């Protein structure tokens, strides 16, 4: 059976984290393809400017502000989109944050916040939207991962952990989604020049502009392949590296990031009693 592939003639697209960076650029691209695009973000002001930017395109952008960590409100947002715009045929879960987690300054708060936004921010929208897609026996879901999912990098214990979980989520759900004619994809980009990467303390080889990354993602969504990782000159070596014995993998990462020689950046204070 050929799995369903989203088409703007069949319904609307929904993009989370669409007020800036990759999400904003991708929403603009989808509107240019003729989609009515429901854009969800914390603040509707940036979405208002996006609406103006896309006013002359074949499709349109409509704001549905919501905090992706709010489970009940996300369910209501899905219902509102379905009622006001039509059936969601394409859901792109892009909302995310980046919190650096160096080993000498760990906090439970940082880990919890990372998973609340990056992982449960997907699940909170995925569950209600799939309920609608399942009834219609067709749908298309895209999850935003990262090449940091392949193995542990310095300072990415929280962020990389969420992206690894997203990849497992997609891999596991694909078995049953295939039976329901719901296509699921995971996109693992390398380093993209967005407000999130400005917080990254690691070297970022192959850093690419948002517009270029978005074009690659748009092609991936159209092609429908399960996993897309790019740029290849970065993703392929990382995949090979992930197959090596862990001590060797860590040695290569320490060398390429100069992390072994990097000093600790925080005072060594005893934990509060």
Stretches with model-predicted labels:
Residues 126, 162:
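Active-site helix of classical SDR
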Residues 186, 202-238:
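C-terminal helical subdomain
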Residues 17-20:
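Conserved glycine-rich cofactor-binding loop
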Residues 102-103, 107-115:
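Substrate-binding pocket helix/loop in short-chain dehydrogenase/reductase
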Residues 33-50:
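Conserved glycine-rich Rossmann-like NAD(P)H-binding loop of the short-chain dehydrogenase/reductase
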Residues 146:
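Residue(s) in the substrate-gating loop at a strand-loop-helix junction
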Residues 65-76, 108:
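The beta1-alpha1 cofactor-binding region of Rossmann-like NAD(H)/NADP(H)-dependent oxidoreductases
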């Amino acid at each position: 059976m050929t799995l369903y592939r989203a088409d703007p003639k069949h319904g609307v697209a929904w993009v989370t984290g669409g007020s800036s960076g990759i999400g904003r650029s991708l929403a603009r691209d989808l509107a240019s393809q003729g989609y009515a695009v429901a854009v969800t973000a914390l603040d509707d002001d940036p979405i208002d400017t996006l609406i103006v930017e896309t006013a002359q395109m074949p499709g349109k952008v409509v704001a549905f502000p919501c905090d992706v960590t709010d489970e009940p409100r996300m369910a209501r947002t899905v219902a509102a989109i379905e009622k006001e715009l039509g059936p969601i045929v394409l859901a792109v879960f892009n909302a995310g944050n980046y919190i650096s987690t160096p080993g000498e300054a760990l906090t439970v708060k940082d880990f919890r916040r990372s998973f609340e936004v990056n992982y449960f921010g997907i699940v909170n929208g995925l569950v209600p939207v799939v309920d609608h897609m399942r009834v219609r026996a067709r749908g298309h879901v895209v999850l935003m991962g990262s090449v940091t999912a392949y193995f542990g990098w310095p300072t990415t214990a929280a962020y990389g952990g969420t992206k690894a979980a997203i990849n497992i989520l997609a891999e596991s759900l694909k078995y049953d989604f295939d039976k329901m004619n719901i296509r699921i994809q995971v996109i693992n980009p390398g380093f993209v020049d967005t407000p999130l990467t400005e917080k990254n303390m690691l070297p970022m080889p192959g850093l690419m502009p948002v517009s270029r990354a978005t074009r690659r993602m748009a092609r991936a969504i159209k092609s429908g392949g399960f996993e897309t990782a790019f740029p290849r000159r970065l993703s392929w070596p990382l995949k090979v590296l992930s197959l090596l014995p862990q001590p060797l993998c860590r040695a290569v990462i320490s060398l390429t990031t100069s992390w072994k020689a990097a000093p600790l950046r925080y005072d060594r204070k005893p934990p509060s009693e």
